[in-house]
Amino acid sequence: MCRNIKTLFNFEPPASDDEIKSASLQFVRKLSGFHTPSKANEEIFSQSVDDVAIIARKLIDSLVTNAEPHNREIEAQRARLRAQQRFG
């Protein structure tokens, strides 16, 4: 799994459209192998990012859980601690 794609479901506040778009861009980059597409692939690359973002939003909005929403600040602190432990 691409480490740059973060879990977006069940957070308070909910995932923004920008966060979903960023995750969609990372996903399409991973699948295509392109960080920046050539002119020949630019249109389909961009359309694919938009399509993935639409489906991702539908998924996130449709999922249900009984779990309490995660707090973004607490999760960010945990991520920083893991990074510090991992990289020193």
Model-assigned labels for residue ranges:
Residues 1-88:
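A charge-rich, low-complexity, intrinsically flexible signal that marks solvent-exposed coils, linkers
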